[in-house]
């Protein structure tokens, strides 16, 4: 065998691996091999449809309490660049992949993905039929799962997973939030990707961020649109926040059941109408809960970078990055306001009706006046964004920071800046121009 052939064989071979087992709470079992830390991990099974960005997914605090399956077949090809991490450490419970790469090729890589998972204590499995797993979760809904490299008895693992905690009712935000207020260090705002982001503009707005599990890229984007950011814990009293004299308040993404995070949405309710607010993902849910909105658990959640969302104001379709398992029940915010809707007085069963009707519905909320539905998911008709008409506040369920994911919705950070500037038409933005001026392409 030639030296070149030996090198190629060494580069593509895998180390001797330990057996691993994945068991779902309905008894479905998948056998594979370990490709991360040793041990057992329990969590809710979900899947992510992103083709790349696994580092950002693994380090996203919103995945706390979950076992994540990547639908793309080969993961780890470009290793792990620590600068891409969204938090200091992964929050997910376990990782499932079809084929793990042990020999990454990328000039930015600091460490291979299997070595990173082992270092961070994340249990992972490879070699299973991830397509079958994803179809099963899609058809039967999200469910508890256990991933083990220690116990190879499926019946034993099934009993243990059925005795594990449910995600519903669990406050996971408190496990990923900061513990004390601190400024976001702009020195952390670095990016050495080959397609660099535009430089941040000078700070002209003071923004307080409720940390429900904030991704680093979100804080970076706030800096890029001119915000001096102070991050505070998830349960910080509204009076403390107002005492900081902010120009705006941002409520971040985060994991778990929004109904369990009462300490946050109670404070958000005290801030609405007193200072401009913007929320993303869990932050959107906190704003909706503060307005009396009800939440529902989705069958298998939205996790990935290919979700089409219609902006009802501009009639543009945005391809969005999403990561949530709960969603707003829009009719729970109030009764429909006429507003040129003709004889329509009852909420349609499917919010995509508003897309077909070319209308943007507005409800009358008992606490905060008129609220418009601004964005609708075209896949399943769920609510994806709202804007308050009588107070300065808006929110979206998806992730406009696009780490990982498409950049279609990056304009929303500019919209927040315009809202703090006092523009009534803050959402009226030339999206194409905004993308060219402030984002990679």
For the regions a language model picked out, list residue spans one by one.
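Proline-centered loop/turn at the N-terminus of a beta-strand
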Residues: 123, 206, 276-278, 294, ...
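Short solvent-exposed loop/turn micro-motifs enriched in small/polar/acidic residues
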Residues: 13-16, 302, 368-369, 378-379
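Catalytic beta-strand/loop cores that center a nucleophilic Ser/Cys/Thr
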Residues: 316-391, 437-441
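RNA-binding accessory domains that recognize and position tRNA/RNA substrates
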Residues: 2-227, 231-239, 243-244, 258, ...
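Cysteine-nucleophile active-site neighborhood
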Residues: 243, 248, 252-334, 405-415, ...
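Short clusters of small/polar residues that mark proteolytic maturation junctions
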Residues: 34-35, 72, 300, 322, ...
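Short FAD-binding loop at a beta-strand-to-alpha-helix junction that anchors the flavin cofactor
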Residues: 392-398
């Amino acid at each position: 065998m030639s030296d070149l052939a030996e090198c190629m064989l060494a580069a593509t071979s895998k180390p001797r691996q330990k057996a691993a087992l994945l068991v779902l709470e309905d008894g479905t079992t998948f056998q594979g091999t370990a490709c991360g830390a040793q041990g057992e991990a329990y969590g809710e099974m979900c899947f992510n449809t992103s083709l790349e960005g696994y580092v950002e997914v693994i380090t996203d605090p919103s995945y706390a309490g979950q076992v994540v399956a990547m639908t793309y077949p080969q993961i780890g090809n470009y290793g792990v660049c620590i600068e891409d991490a969204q938090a200091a450490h992964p929050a997910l419970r376990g990782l499932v992949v079809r084929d793990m790469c042990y020999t990454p090729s990328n000039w930015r890589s600091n460490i291979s993905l299997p070595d990173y998972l082992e270092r961070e204590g994340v249990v992972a499995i490879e070699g299973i039929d991830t397509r079958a797993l994803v179809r099963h979760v899609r058809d039967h809904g999200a469910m508890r799962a256990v991933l083990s490299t220690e116990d190879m008895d499926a019946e034993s693992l099934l009993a243990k997973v059925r005795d594990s905690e449910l995600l519903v009712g669990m406050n996971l935000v408190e496990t990923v939030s900061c513990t004390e207020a601190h400024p976001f260090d702009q020195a952390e705002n670095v990016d050495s990707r080959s397609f660099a982001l535009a430089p941040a503009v000078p700070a002209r707005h003071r923004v307080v961020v409720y940390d429900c599990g904030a991704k680093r890229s979100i804080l970076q984007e706030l800096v890029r649109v001119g915000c001096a950011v102070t991050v505070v814990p998830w349960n910080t009293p509204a009076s403390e926040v107002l005492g900081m004299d902010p120009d705006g308040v941002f409520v971040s993404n985060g994991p778990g059941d929004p109904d369990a995070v009462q300490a946050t949405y109670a404070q958000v309710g005290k801030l609405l109408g007193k200072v401009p607010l913007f929320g993303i993902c869990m932050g959107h849910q906190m704003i909706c809960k503060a307005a009396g909105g009800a939440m529902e658990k989705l069958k298998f959640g939205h996790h990935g970078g290919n979700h089409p969302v219609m902006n009802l104001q501009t009639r543009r379709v945005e391809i969005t990055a999403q990561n949530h398992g709960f969603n707003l029940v829009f009719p729970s915010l109030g009764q429909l306001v006429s507003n040129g809707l003709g004889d329509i007085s009852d909420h349609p069963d499917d919010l995509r009706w508003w897309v077909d009707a070319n209308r943007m519905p507005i409800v009358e909320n008992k606490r905060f006046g008129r609220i418009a539905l601004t964005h609708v998911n075209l896949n399943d008709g769920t609510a994806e964004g709202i804007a308050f008409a009588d107070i300065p506040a808006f929110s979206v369920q998806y992730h406009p920071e696009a780490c990982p994911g498409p950049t279609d919705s990056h304009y929303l950070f500019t919209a927040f800046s315009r809202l703090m500037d006092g523009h009534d038409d803050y959402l009226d933005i030339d999206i194409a121009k905004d993308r060219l001026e402030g984002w990679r392409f």
